[in-house]
Regions:
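Walker A/P-loop NTP-binding motif
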Residues: 74-75, 94-107, 124-128
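Conserved RecA-like P-loop NTPase helicase motor core
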Residues: 510-520, 570-675
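Conserved helicase motor "Helicase C" RecA-like lobe of SF1/SF2 P-loop NTPases
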Residues: 545-569
Length: 708
């Protein structure tokens, strides 16, 4: 969810839509000359057997679908059109869009779903194409790789800390020494270079270059700033590789700033490729929303205190203002409904009737803090940033509590997992780790329909967009993704996978298991999971739609399997994946974070078991609001939204298994509603052409050559 400086006010959407675009334009030429060796030949000569790619890369295999997709992308760029492409796993979609991008002679942003895919593009795919296009090494592609601002060091913050140390504990002192030494040598300021720095480092949060603490061009380190340097590299590049979070954070900042020239970090660009485009609705919704929390209140008062201590600007008046925000915030958030997790805040009006004085008192305390900061006689530039943050919190709090915007759902999320079981307790965000053990409370405002915003703020401003993923189509069409994203006019293409799914994979659905929603399901499902794992000799992901189901079945199987059992929550995701890869016959039990973006090739992963059709939790406030809006508009939310969303998630989960031509294995779905319910046909028709069975003996036969 967007936070201070990362989102734009939903209240301003209509005004923003009326204005001309100042952040995208029809065509931005390449900063260098078009790549003539690429532009001088038809695409077929690159991809064909005996073509340029196969000559430079002996392991390259011709894939007709890859050529087909590449031609479609080239046409979209040439004809200034939008394009939606589902490219099955193994298509080679990154090369399929990279080559026409290079040939186009235009500046193009490539936005990916994950940092891992960014790294693959920048460190593997682009260099491979470069070697093929320029075998003599006489030319270089102009490419840059950008992450979110919080990945980069703020030199000013580091130097301020050097002058006025505010460190807590030996660990922070060690981290400070490592960062200070690294700052002298790094060219990028990217924290990924600091392998020894923990992901949840509290010190890094004090030193990162996030937008809400940035002084911009008024900063004395502006010229040497790593963000400034990143902007320069991007402005000089033809291909800019980002991730969806950075792209939409940047877009929301530009919308909020009304096109101010120094807003955001991405340069003007008329063409964008969205890889892993099935994630766009959720991510865009987060950045087009608002989040106000007790954590943000605490961070504001803490940052004000640190500045005043450093600059010796403390006055009794401002000390009182800080204390007032703290006390009023603590009281206000303690009065909010005490439900756990995510829940709709439908009782805002009743809440304000009962607690209006406390709400107004918190607003007034934020106003007073901003006013006291403005009254300081000597104001370093940081004061203006802090004043803006106080004012922004005040306005956002009023919006979340008072707005009647019909396209917005208002809800509350409690994080901190007080009293939660171990696996849940470890799934904390970096914000929560900074705040300690207490519960953090987030007041959220999220757009119900992202499509309207994207239609007006993005698609209508771009010359060309290409949306691609292995999981975009539902039932052989793109109606769902087009409607959810507001992309009314786009060419469509489905490229079949290069894999022979019918011989490489078998899909097994147990015919007699109870409904997954019943209490009897877990015990019987555990028995089926055990038998399947014995057939496959482990080597499996067992994926769940809930932590509770995962924990129950894991506990039932403990001591019954001879294979190493790994469970999400017992270690960081990266450590679990590495242990899975190096442990023969391991079984990994996981939830949503293992359903996508995970790649384990070869026999080590020979089985993926999914507990149930992955329908979104109907009580989730955002899901419930979208369902209500569709039904109120005369639609059928179950078939128009809930089923298609679950289809795409299921395709993602099953997509973990077959990652190469040599992979082979079992897909098991422990939910026979796919066979018994009318809507099950939509799932079946959307999946690849796996061999299918309800007979477990067929599974044994499939693995017959492997079973000793």
């Amino acid at each position: 969810m967007a936070t201070s400086g990362d989102g734009f006010f939903l209240l301003k959407v209509v005004d923003e839509l009326r204005g001309p675009s100042r952040y995208y334009r029809d065509s931005v030429p390449s900063s260098s000359h078009p790549v003539s060796p690429a532009a001088g030949f038809p695409l077929y000569q690159f991809f064909a057997p005996g073509g340029l790619l196969s000559k430079k890369h002996p392991a390259y295999e011709f894939r007709r679908g890859q050529l087909q997709m590449s031609q479609a992308v080239e046409e979209a760029l040439e004809e200034k059109r939008h394009l939606i492409v589902e490219a099955g796993t193994g298509t080679g979609k990154t090369l399929a869009y990279l080559l026409p991008v290079i040939r186009s002679g235009k500046r193009v942003i490539i936005s990916t779903g994950t940092k891992n895919l960014q790294e693959q593009l920048f460190f593997k795919d682009v260099p491979a194409l470069e070697r093929a296009l320029f075998p003599e090494g006489d030319r270089k592609l102009s490419v840059c790789y950008m992450k979110g601002r919080n990945n980069y060091l703020c030199r000013k913050k580091l130097f301020d800390l050097t002058d006025q140390p505010v460190l807590s504990g030996l660990e922070e002192i060690e981290h400070y020494r490592a960062i200070a030494a690294w700052e002298k040598t790094t060219q990028t300021g990217d924290r990924a270079e600091l392998a020894e720095l923990p992901e949840a480092s509290a010190l890094w949060y004090k030193l990162d270059a996030r937008a809400d603490t940035c002084l911009g061009q008024k900063c004395k380190e502006w010229e040497r700033c790593f963000i400034t340097e990143m902007r320069r590299r991007a402005a000089e590049s033809d291909i800019i590789i980002v991730n969806h979070h950075l792209f939409f954070a940047d877009l929301s900042i530009k919308l909020e700033a009304d096109g101010a020239p120094d807003a955001g970090v991405l340069p003007e660009c008329g063409s964008v490729i969205f890889d892993e485009a099935h994630e766009l609705e959720e991510i865009a919704g987060n950045y087009f929303g608002i989040s106000v929390s007790n954590l943000r209140m605490d961070e504001l008062t803490r940052d004000v205190e640190h500045l005043l201590q450093r600059e010796k600007l403390y006055t009794p008046q401002i000390s009182g203002a800080i204390q007032s925000v703290r006390e009023r915030s603590q009281l206000f958030f303690s009065l909010l409904p005490a439900n756990e997790g995510r829940f709709a805040f439908d009782s805002r009006r009743e809440f304000l009737e009962e607690n209006g004085e406390e709400f107004l008192a918190l607003n007034q305390s934020l106003y007073r803090l901003g006013a006291e900061l403005e009254q300081l006689p000597q104001k370093p530039e940081e004061v203006f940033t802090l004043t803006r943050r106080a004012q922004q919190l005040q306005v956002q709090l009023r919006f979340v509590m008072e707005s009647e915007d019909p396209n917005t759902v208002f809800w509350i999320e409690r994080r901190g997992f007080r009293g939660a079981p171990g696996a849940l307790a470890r799934q904390k965000s970096s914000e929560e780790k900074r705040a300690g053990a207490r519960t953090n409370i987030f007041l959220q405002a999220t757009p119900i329909e992202v499509g309207q915003i994207l239609r007006e703020c993005l698609w209508s401003k771009l010359e060309t967009s290409v949306l691609t993923s292995a999981t975009l189509a539902v039932g052989g069409g793109f109606d769902y993704i087009r409607q959810r994203l507001g992309l009314d006019h786009a060419r469509e293409l489905i490229v079949a996978s290069h894999f022979d799914y019918e011989s490489q994979a078998i899909l097994y659905v147990p015919p007699d298991l109870p409904d997954p929603r019943t209490p009897q399901f877990a015990a019987e499902a555990a028995g089926i999971v055990r038998r399947l794992l014995e057939i496959t000799r482990g080597r499996a992901f067992v994926l769940f739609t809930s932590y509770a189901q995962m924990n129950e079945i894991f506990e039932r199987l403990l001591g019954q399997l001879k294979f190493s059992m790994l469970k999400q929550g017992d270690a960081p995701k990266s450590a679990l994946l590495e242990e899975f890869r190096v442990t023969p016959n391991a079984v990994l039990f996981g939830t949503s974070s293992f359903w996508q973006g995970v790649d384990v090739q070869g026999q080590q992963l020979s089985c993926v078991i999914i507990d149930r059709l992955p329908f979104a939790v109907p009580s989730d406030p955002v899901v419930a609001a979208r369902v209500k809006a569709i039904d109120a508009g005369g639609g059928n939310a179950f078939f128009e939204y809930q089923v298609p969303s679950a289809v795409i998630t299921l395709k993602q989960g099953f997509g973990r298994l077959i990652r190469s031509l040599h992979d082979r294995g079992l897909l098991a779905l422990l939910d026979n509603r796919i066979l018994k319910k009318q809507y099950g046909r939509v799932f079946v028709e959307s999946l690849p052409n796996y061999a299918k069975t309800t007979d477990i003996k067929k599974v044994e036969e499939f693995f017959g050559a492997d079973v000793g």
